[in-house]
């Protein structure tokens, strides 16, 4: 076999400007590293501020114990991380939405960080007051309550992650709960594609149409038509009325005829007073023995 063109490695792609030994696995690891950095940068400032707050609180308790001061216990809400880890996810993959949540709640997270730092400095000052016996028990109780309130506020923000990550098991189930997992191709094959294709014997004006029914605004099923949520059976109803085999745009319509503006008879229909045959077309397509309105 003759040698390939100069500068092209036989059997391996050339990665411009990089070591040719750099593999797809290496690229994947680099991407993973970037993802980890994003998570760390998003959460580490809050984690660090909470760690400093914990250290200042523990130091305060030690000093208070040495000086025979009693401090009410903190009320610390539990963040149920276990249920978040084990719950049925809303989306797949499960956890990327956490980064979006943190981004959406950036202001609250920054407030938690700033408040934690202020409380840390406050606890250090209170520790000094205890050492010099310049503080009373009521003030210590207020300090404990203030810190408990902060932890409740912080825990509320973090616990709300569960509603973002996890499905609500108390909500009623819906047959399309996991439709977000459908690919466009599978949706077309199932007849549920929201834009771009009618399937089977249905019609699609705004893109969909399923089975033999027709539905523009959320209603019609079976062989009926429904533009505004009503008509069923073999009738057609634009404004909430006509049933049976008739057709009614403005409230009347009888027999097997169609009437848009007061005319059409027989098995045909009239938009402006004409049109016959057994089919019809609103946009130039139609099926069967239709007539095309735009050609009249």
From Swiss-Prot:
* Propeptide boundaries: 1-134, 146-190, 290-296
Q: Which UniProt keywords apply?
A: Cleavage on pair of basic residues
- On whether ATP-binding is a keyword of this UniProt record, the answer is no
Top-rank taxon: Eukaryota
Please indicate if the UniProt record lists Glycoprotein as a keyword.
no
Q: What does this protein do?
A: Causes stimulation of sperm respiration and motility through intracellular alkalinization, transient elevations of cAMP, cGMP and calcium levels in sperm cells, and transient activation and subsequent inactivation of the membrane form of guanylate cyclase.
Protein name as catalogued: Sperm-activating peptides
Q: What is the lineage of its organism?
A: Eukaryota, Metazoa, Echinodermata, Eleutherozoa, Echinozoa
